[in-house]
């Protein structure tokens, strides 16, 4: 991804008035000369072209491409990676100038690539709190094969009509040279949109250079090679580009070189450039206008107050629409001069004279340090990140610069609403006006507590929202302050304390609302058997795209606390499971079994915690429904409302759920039930019952393929009760609950197709005689990779252990180690002995987090979608802003080797990765899902992205044991837990909604 700030099509801009671009020297000389083009003087186009070539040859040696990542969301910047440009402004000390939105407000990791393709690490030493510039530093001694040259900053040379070149990493193409002419030097700054970085209180320079992403931070040079401006942004649908003047960057550079503080002053007011005609409408006195025009003959505008921030130094003094006339008794119409005065007046009084309508108003404001209201630290806790509200964001929404901003709403604080833009008001009914108060409040909250949080959206201060969150200090253990260190360029971590232990759950009793028997008939009492389920997953595994899932579960055994839900709600066993009874009581639960082929997840809760709540166990009927059977449908729609209808079974078929591009669990080899009622498409969970209230089928949500927009397609289907009963009986009896399974996936085919493929007529007659209703057989569509291929794709199953197979339930092998099968292969009937396989290790039981990527063994959905496994190290996800993101290690890839050493499994991978030093490159051999080999180089970053090894362990807290590897050979228990990966988490909650 290449980053370049872009203005919206409707961004504010001021007309330049009557100014027109001056003719360039070439045109002027050609006009004056009476000679032919061949006889041009050396000062003509030929000399100009030569001069440009010489200047550009020198400039390109100072320009670098920057490849960087912001590893954490902070202020206006999301976490992510990008490419941009920079240029050397001090070769001796190693300073580079680029944009603030490149240097990033938050943690930055990056390197620069010079013209000769030498690479050097860079780190930020300064990012301006307001303007779009910052400085990176590098070690000049690390550049061995070229002389590093610096460019001179000449803000005085930026004039209308100046021919310029933009030299940089345009479109991430390493080096591009774009030509243009400066057309304006007094335009207002572009507006890049909400909740993103926007410059203010300066003028911008405009030219039509048609730059694109990646050119941010490029030098804008004139023909002698002097830098006259800094490329900052551009229009999305035009060739227009916007440049930052260099007056303030030049001052900051001098301060860095002299090792003096870069003071920045503010009165917390935004000014805009307004033309004289606009100022006249606001009340500008004609005598004052004449005075200004006389002093500044080329002036076309003055400064007008646009925004005054509440509780700031100028609050209740300046007002919107005030025209600035004097500052400290000096007429001032230039934003750069205003900034210069404020920067030199931090802590001092500044006297302003403004025209307000027909009145002249003189007022005094004390200039405040802008650095004091630009956050340089954040707190990470419960998987989310918090910092004091910044001047940048407060200015955009005219808010006082106070409050706690949630820069990364994740983990426990993944709140309902938009993805970003939350201001936290209170926790546990205690106000949190600033970050220090927030820390003290969080210290007193035990792990797993459910606490009230008050918050509002930054764009809507009138609507205060109260919600309840569950504090997670067991998966996401980190509670630390992260502070910017401009000496090292890193952000330093400081532990803020261990979590208080969770308080034990206490029994509670509630009543269950009764349904009207007249309206709901035989299903009225089934409401007593349902509980709601909330599953929170701190890591994305097995191709899952969500952090939270909501659904319902049917209680099967109230004495043992056993219930069943779908694997669309509980896809894997790493997370926190909570059930809600009668919308009143919430208690913890745990996953006890995930069925390897059916869409069933069995969960367990402590019945004692429900006290005398009249929860009931559903009665399941050991009966397979048939087409045409009358049933009662009882379900929960997308709003969790109960609906019911009397209907009938329309079909019972062997369903094949389409697979998604990123493999994830899907039910295979099962018979699905559909019903006539339209309610079935609106409900993601429920049951089908007979007229006696016995459950004959569960109603479940299945995830299938994805649409072209990337949204999940959901299928709502019924599953017969006998399938559930077989697992329930195992759980109740205490025997091994994991069934044996076949290593293949089937699909149903008609006998006519089998006949065409060579099945003898006598066998078809026998099948028709035995099957009765179903004239079908089953064809192998996938064989699980990594298992013996006794059966192959395209085989047709004729019989198993002497019985014709026309229904999928005839192939149940729960307790069978081997099956004698008669198959049709390549037109010939054959007999084979097919082994079954235990499903004990079907689920993910080890996870390695490295480079910000989540690695695991290929889960069963992967093995059923691929022919052969390149390795047993599978990338299931990656975090934004991580080394994996920056160096293009993508999801659904396999890691086959590390530094040339084959890594067949996670054990091999961890062994090799522990040998590698921090900040060094590692050569990673990978294979795509389609077996295309790719070799990557990834830089280790153990400061922000340590390697963490998670192994399922029943004796450990949460059922998982975690080990963190920092230095080579060093092993310790992780104090930070791990960071939730939100890259593909495209919704706060995933509910069992309408079928798509």
Swiss-Prot record:
This is PDZ domain-containing protein C23G3.12c. InterPro entries: PDZ (IPR001478), PDZ-like_dom (IPR025926), PDZ_sf (IPR036034), Peptidase_S1_PA (IPR009003), Peptidase_S1C (IPR001940). One of its GO terms (molecular function) is serine-type endopeptidase activity. One of its GO terms (biological process) is lipid metabolic process. Coiled coil: none annotated. It comes from Schizosaccharomyces pombe (strain 972 / ATCC 24843) (Fission yeast). Residues 980-996 have a biased composition (Acidic residues). Residues 1-35, 972-996 are annotated as: Disordered. Pfam families: PDZ_1, Trypsin_2. One of its GO terms (cellular component) is nucleus. PANTHER family: PRO-APOPTOTIC SERINE PROTEASE NMA111. Residues 280-358, 745-827, 860-930 form the PDZ domain. It comes from the Eukaryota.
């Amino acid at each position: 991804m290449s980053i370049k700030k872009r203005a919206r099509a409707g961004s504010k801009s001021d007309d330049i008035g009557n100014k027109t671009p001056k003719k360039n020297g070439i045109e002027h000389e050609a006009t004056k000369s009476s000679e032919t083009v061949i006889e041009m003087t050396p000062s003509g186009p030929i000399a100009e072209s030569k001069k440009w070539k010489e200047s550009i040859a020198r400039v390109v040696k100072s320009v670098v491409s920057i490849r960087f990542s912001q590893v954490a969301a902070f202020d206006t910047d999301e976490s992510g990676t990008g490419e941009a440009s920079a240029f050397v402004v001090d070769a001796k000390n190693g300073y580079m100038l680029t944009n603030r939105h490149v240097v990033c407000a938050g943690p930055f990791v990056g390197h620069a690539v010079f013209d000769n393709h030498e690479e050097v690490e860079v780190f930020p030493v300064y990012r301006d709190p307001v303007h779009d510039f910052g400085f990176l530093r590098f070690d000049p001694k690390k550049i061995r094969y070229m002389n590093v040259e610096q460019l001179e900053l000449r803000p005085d040379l930026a004039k209308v009509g100046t021919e310029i070149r933009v030299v940089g990493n345009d479109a991430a193409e390493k080096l591009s040279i774009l030509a243009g002419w400066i057309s304006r030097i007094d335009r207002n700054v572009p507006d890049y949109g909400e909740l993103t970085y926007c410059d203010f209180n300066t003028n911008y320079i405009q030219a039509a250079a048609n730059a694109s992403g990646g050119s941010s931070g490029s030098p804008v040079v004139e023909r002698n090679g002097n830098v006259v401006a800094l490329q900052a942004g551009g229009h999305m649908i035009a060739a227009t580009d916007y440049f930052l003047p260099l007056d303030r960057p030049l001052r900051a550079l001098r301060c860095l070189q002299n090792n003096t503080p870069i003071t920045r002053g503010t009165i917390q007011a935004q000014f805009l450039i307004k033309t004289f005609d606009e100022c006249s409408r606001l009340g500008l006195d004609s005598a004052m206008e004449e005075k200004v025009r006389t002093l500044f003959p080329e002036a076309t505008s003055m400064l007008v107050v646009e925004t005054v921030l509440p509780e700031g130094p100028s609050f209740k003094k300046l007002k919107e629409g005030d025209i600035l006339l004097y500052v400290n008794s000096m007429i001032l119409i230039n934003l750069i001069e205003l900034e210069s005065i404020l920067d030199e007046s931090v802590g001092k009084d500044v006297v302003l004279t403004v025209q307000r309508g027909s009145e002249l108003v003189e007022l005094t404001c004390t200039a405040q340090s802008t650095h004091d209201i630009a956050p340089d630290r954040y707190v990470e806790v419960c998987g989310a990140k918090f910092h004091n509200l910044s001047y940048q964001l407060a200015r955009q929404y005219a808010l006082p610069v106070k409050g706690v901003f949630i820069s990364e709403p994740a983990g426990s604080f993944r709140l309902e609403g938009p993805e970003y833009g939350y201001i936290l008001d209170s926790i546990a009914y205690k106000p949190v006006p600033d970050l220090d108060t927030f820390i003290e409040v969080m210290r007193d909250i035990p792990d797993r507590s459910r606490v009230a949080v008050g918050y509002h959206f930054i764009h809507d201060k009138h609507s205060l929202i109260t919600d309840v969150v569950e504090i997670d200090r067991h998966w996401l253990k980190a509670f630390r302050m992260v502070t910017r260190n401009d000496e090292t360029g890193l952000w330093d971590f400081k532990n803020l304390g261990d979590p208080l232990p969770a308080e034990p759950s206490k029994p509670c009793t509630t009543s269950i609302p009764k349904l009207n028997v007249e309206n709901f008939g035989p299903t009225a009492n089934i409401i007593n058997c349902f509980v709601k389920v909330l599953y929170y997953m701190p890591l994305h595994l097995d191709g899952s795209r969500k952090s939270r899932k909501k659904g319902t579960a049917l209680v099967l055994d109230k004495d043992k606390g056993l219930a069943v839900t779908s694997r669309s709600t509980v896809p894997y066993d790493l997370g926190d499971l909570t059930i809600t009874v009668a919308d009143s009581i919430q208690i913890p639960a745990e996953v006890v079994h995930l069925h390897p082929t059916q869409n069933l997840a069995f969960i367990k809760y402590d019945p004692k915690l429900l006290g005398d709540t009249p929860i009931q166990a559903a009665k399941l009927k050991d009966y397979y429904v048939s087409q045409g059977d009358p049933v009662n449908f009882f379900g929960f729609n997308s709003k969790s409302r109960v609906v019911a209808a009397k209907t009938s079974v329309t079909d019972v078929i062997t369903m094949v759920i389409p697979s998604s591009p990123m493999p994830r669990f899907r039910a295979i080899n099962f018979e699905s039930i559909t019903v006539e009622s339209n309610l079935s498409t609106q409900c993601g969970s429920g049951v089908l019952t007979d007229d006696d209230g016995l459950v004959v089928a569960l109603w479940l949500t299945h995830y299938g393929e994805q649409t072209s927009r990337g949204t999940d397609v959901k299928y709502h289907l019924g599953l017969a009760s006998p399938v559930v009963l077989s697992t329930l009986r195992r759980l109740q009896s205490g025997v091994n609950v994991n069934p044996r399974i076949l290593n293949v996936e089937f699909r149903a085919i008609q006998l006519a197709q089998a006949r065409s493929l060579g099945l003898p007529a006598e066998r078809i007659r026998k099948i028709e005689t035995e099957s009765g209703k179903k004239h079908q057989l089953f064809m192998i569509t996938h064989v699980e990779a990594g298992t013996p291929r006794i059966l192959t794709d395209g085989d047709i199953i004729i019989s198993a252990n002497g019985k014709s197979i026309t229904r999928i339930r005839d192939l149940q092998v729960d307790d069978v180690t081997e099956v004698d099968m008669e198959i049709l292969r390549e037109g010939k009937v054959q007999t084979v002995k097919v082994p079954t396989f235990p499903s004990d290790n079907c689920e993910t039981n080890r996870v390695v987090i490295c480079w910000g990527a989540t690695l695991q063994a290929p889960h069963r959905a992967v093995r059923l979608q691929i022919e052969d496994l390149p390795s047993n190290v599978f990338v299931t996800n990656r975090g934004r802003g991580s080394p994996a993101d920056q160096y293009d290690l993508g999801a659904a890839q396999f890691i086959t080797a590390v530094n040339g050493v084959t890594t067949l499994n996670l054990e091999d991978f961890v062994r090799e990765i522990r040998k590698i030093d921090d900040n060094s490159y590692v050569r990673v051999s990978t294979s795509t899902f389609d077996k295309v080999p790719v070799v990557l180089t990834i830089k280790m970053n153990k400061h922000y992205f340590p390697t963490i090894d998670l192994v399922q362990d029943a004796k450990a807290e949460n059922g998982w044991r975690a080990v963190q590897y920092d230095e080579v050979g060093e092993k310790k228990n992780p104090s930070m837990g791990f960071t939730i990966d939100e890259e593909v988490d495209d919704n706060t909650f995933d509910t069992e909604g309408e079928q798509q």
